[in-house]
Amino acid sequence: MASPKLHDFRHIVVKVGSSLLIDSAAGEVRAGWLAALAADIAELHRGGRDVMVVSSGSIALGRSRLKLPRGPLKLEESQAAAAVGQIELARTWSEVLGAHGIGAGQILVTFQDTEERRRYLNARSTIAKLLEWRAVPVINENDTVATTEIRYGDNDRLAARVATMASADLLILLSDIDGLYTAPPGSNPDATLIPVVEAITAEIEGMAGAAGSELSRGGMRTKIEAAKIATSAGTHMLIASGKIDHPLKAIADGGKCTWFLTPANPVTARKRWIAGTLEPKGTLTIDAGAVSALRAGKSLLPAGVIRVDGQFSRGDAVIVRGPDTHEIGRGLVAYDAEDAEKIKGHSSPDVMMILGITGRAEMIHRDDLVVGTAPT
């Protein structure tokens, strides 16, 4: 199968590791390289694409600023170093993107933010709003509060979760190697690059090494794990070298890389997950006008809801039924059951007056809604 082209994609997540971003000897950001990457991002941005960045580097920058000795850090030392480094990292990205007239928004996430549905929806909504405002979200694991037991441990898998959360159609992992090889290229002269992976088989997994460095916790094995997460959610992924200047331009020009392809797309994969995987926690019964609106691709507004049943929290899956009780679809609800009961039948502008807060305009956003027959 032929490799796709970078400009075929509209919603792109770019992951940048510590070993690329930070000069390990000097403990400083590789300013020239980052400026070149920012220029690449700006070019995609000018083309109307949504670009999100998952950036490592907070711990590495923090330990440099604090003049900590080389070697492994204890958990509390890593957390404290990250607290210092996160400020430096945010400032750095703001400056390099600002040079192109692009705003940067920092988002610090934890493992729970992508696994617990209420927090998942909050993070997803924040990313969506930044993209709507044509800013570039810069995302990192919140190493200041993450624990050894509950964390991603590497930003490859975090990037895959972010790509899934944001319904990205492409995840780019910039690495110190230009793709997946049949064997470790540093020690095997017969190793060859695999340009396209259509399915992640046991053989493909066996090709993944465990290489890493003091600054970068990830190796090829974690990249394969990231590819599993991304492709199962309908997101294509590629691994390419970030050691060169203008790495995204190199990809666009057909440079060496490995593509991990998926036959699905993010929207269908996400809606399949909502319709067939999540257990519904309640039911919303809607009027005939709302039924017509949903079938026309609209979101479900509070005004169209006539009955609320069940005990559910924001982010839970619920069944949507028409006035004849037939199932219309399923979706992730933006309000818990108590608040949904209060605002049912009311127009969206009334929500603030009723709840005392500025809530979502939609009871279920169309991106979180599957309209059709009940799954079998």
Curated annotation (Swiss-Prot):
SMART domains: PUA
EC numbers, comma separated: 2.7.2.11
Gene3D superfamilies: Acetylglutamate kinase-like, PUA domain
Subcellular location, record wording: Cytoplasm
Catalytic activity: L-glutamate + ATP = L-glutamyl 5-phosphate + ADP
Coiled-coil segments on the chain, per record: none
SUPFAM superfamilies from the UniProt entry: Carbamate kinase-like, PUA domain-like
Binding site for substrate: S56, D143, N155
InterPro entries: AceGlu_kinase-like_sf, Asp/Glu/Uridylate_kinase, G5K_ProB, Glu/AcGlu_kinase, Glu_5kinase, Glu_5kinase/COase_Synthase, Glutamate_5-kinase_CS, PUA
Boundaries of every PUA domain copy: 281-358
Gene Ontology MF terms in the entry: ATP binding; glutamate 5-kinase activity; RNA binding
Residues holding ATP: K15, S175, D176
A GO CC annotation given for this chain: cytosol
Root EC class: transferase
Keywords: Amino-acid biosynthesis, ATP-binding, Cytoplasm, Kinase, Nucleotide-binding, Proline biosynthesis, Transferase
GO biological process, one term: L-proline biosynthetic process
One family name in Pfam for this protein: PUA
Pathway stated in the Swiss-Prot or TrEMBL entry: Amino-acid biosynthesis; L-proline biosynthesis; L-glutamate 5-semialdehyde from L-glutamate: step 1/2
Family membership: Belongs to the glutamate 5-kinase family.
Function: Catalyzes the transfer of a phosphate group to glutamate to form L-glutamate 5-phosphate.
HAMAP family named among the record's database cross-references: ProB
Name of the protein this chain belongs to: Glutamate 5-kinase
